[in-house]
Amino acid sequence: MGNCCPGSGDAEPASSDASTGNGSSSFKAGASPSSAPAQNKPPAPIGPVLGRPMEDVRSIYTIGKELGRGQFGVTSLCTHKATGQKFACKTIAKRKLSTKEDVEDVRREVQIMYHLAGQPNVVELKGAYEDKQSVHLVMELCAGGELFDRIIAKGHYTERAAASLLRTIVEIIHTCHSLGVIHRDLKPENFLLLSKDEDAPLKATDFGLSVFFKQGEVFKDIVGSAYYIAPEVLKRSYGPEADIWSVGVILYILLCGVPPFWAESEHGIFNSILRGQVDFTSDPWPRISASAKDLVRKMLNSDPKKRISAYEVLNHPWIKEDGEAPDTPLDNAVMNRLKQFRAMNQFKKAALRVIAGCLSEEEIRGLKEMFKSMDSDNSGTITVDELRKGLSKQGTKLTEAEVQQLMEAADADGNGTIDYDEFITATMHMNRMDREEHLYTAFQYFDKDNSGCISKEELEQALREKGLLDGRDIKDIISEVDADNDGRIDYSEFAAMMRKGNPEANPKKRRDVVI
């Protein structure tokens, strides 16, 4: 992976500051400096994931309420026992780390976060701990909400405000690239506000898919979130330029309220990205400045070699402080679309949390065995005929159309066969999103009175329980999902919403916990 950091056991910087909780087994919060060391205490065993002595995070922090939950773990509020300072603790269950690649991914996430330590707009990793059951990452707590929250809270919006936000984002990416790191999952949800103060800094978070890179190194695995994935990622040949594309998509959304590449399915979104046709004719684009459109075009150039760099973005006249970005308010429709786009993402997040709990560890393991049994000629790839026969033998009830859909979605390189990674990615995606029982389980979570419909009150109650929405967003969701305009969401409307442009492109690789 071109790592430019030391091994995971050496990644953590030394510190004697108790408030950092730096995971060093030589210091316990609250211990007296004059305390005599324990006699004949056996050394702690070395953890297989982090490669250093295991330590109980609860000896330093009090773990509090759950903040978020994902397929691979839970994020909780935690409090440092000695100082009372609050942090976020991301806990990854070791039983979920079933492959060597999984373990390496966690190690790399820790290495990268320590490598970026001290950068003012990157969430700081305070400590990494490992016990017998889990790995715990204690991080700076960002309590101010997501990127769009600041825009929506102000109630008015200008190109100059968008330029200011984008400048911070690109400065973060420029720093990452200068330090040899590609983020690979840039999206509005991964930029959080440190607090609810108006001048609170914006922080980049979620480095679970990030990698170290060397100049000229080429990556091939498809990772990220569908709307924001660069075309060269889908072609399995990319470098740091892919981050610029993702930020270009964010800029497009900031200016008009919707993504530039849209379709009814993830596969359709990918096709739209590969076509690369960006709409600058629909409202509000005729009223957006020429300078803003010029920057978007340069960031969304389908050829990564011709795409503008982070340094060049920062020197573009539109993004510069007191530059060309006009200070006149953007169309109210842009604000409404932003609210709706954010609200829909939040609704899906809540539903995905329910669905994530439906896919068992046994199902994941079973998918690996399924691939082996389908690959009848042991070629390492399977054809559509092998897929059809294999699914039938497994007793999986899929229609011919669903088999074809699976094949098309999985065959990322378009060569007519799917390899192991493509198969696991696509089948896990189907298990999480398209299986009827999983969707229905999620629907029932919202349908509190079992009436067969989700009312405004039920939706508000469920999302408030998850801490995801305030009341202003409920109307936006209802109006978007409620196809028959009866003021409620029935199962067919819910299922259509869940299947529309699912944002997760590679669930197999993901270890992030959605907050």
From Swiss-Prot:
It is an enzyme of class 2 (transferase). The keyword Amino-acid biosynthesis does not apply. GO terms for molecular function: ATP binding; calcium ion binding; calcium-dependent protein serine/threonine kinase activity; calcium/calmodulin-dependent protein kinase activity; calmodulin binding; protein serine kinase activity. Expressed in heading panicles, spikelets and mature pollen grains. It comes from the Eukaryota. GO terms for cellular component: cytoplasm; membrane; nucleus. It is a lipid-anchor. Its EC number is 2.7.11.1. May play a role in signal transduction pathways that involve calcium as a second messenger. Belongs to the protein kinase superfamily. Ser/Thr protein kinase family. CDPK subfamily. This is Calcium-dependent protein kinase 2. It comes from Oryza sativa subsp. japonica. The lineage of its organism: Eukaryota, Viridiplantae, Streptophyta, Embryophyta, Tracheophyta.
